[in-house]
Amino acid sequence: MSWQAYIDNLIANGKVDKAALYSRAGDALWAQSGSFELQQPEITEIAKGFDSAEGLQTSGLHVQGQKYFLLRADDRSIYGKHEAEGVICVRTKQTILIAHYPSGVQPGEATTLVEKLADYLINVGY
């Protein structure tokens, strides 16, 4: 399956409306939905946030120019929220998966789907 197919399948469920897959270092975009592409400082901020959440705790999480309130940050997952929408970032062995859910979607439903895809990627060596 191509990287793009993973993103397309994630979007098809209706719980996530935008997603992208980056290299673990955040230096290469592997797949994306539509125009969901982060600016380099945004993906760098996320990539560093997995190792140290201090910067995210201080200044928030930024995705496509929007600031999200940091809900959780550890070495695997970063969650952010802005009003009724949110962002889920999960780091695997070789990738960073970033997904956005719109208002009207329960955060737990979107999070479960994104985390399951990350688990799958980890299990197949990515």
UniProtKB/Swiss-Prot annotation:
Q: Which UniProt keywords apply?
A: Actin-binding, Cytoplasm, Cytoskeleton
- Where does it live in the cell? Cytoplasm, Cytoskeleton
User: Matching InterPro entries, A to Z?
Assistant: PFN (IPR048278), PFN_euk (IPR005455), PFN_sf (IPR036140), Profilin_CS (IPR027310)
Lineage, top-rank taxon, reads Eukaryota
Q: Which GO terms describe its molecular function?
A: actin monomer binding; phosphatidylinositol-4,5-bisphosphate binding; proline-rich region binding; protein sequestering activity
Looking up CDD domains in the UniProt record yields: PROF
GO BP terms in the entry: intracellular transport; mitotic actomyosin contractile ring assembly; positive regulation of formin-nucleated actin cable assembly
**What family is reported?**
Belongs to the profilin family.
Q: How does it assemble?
A: Occurs in many kinds of cells as a complex with monomeric actin in a 1:1 ratio.
Q: What is this protein called?
A: Profilin
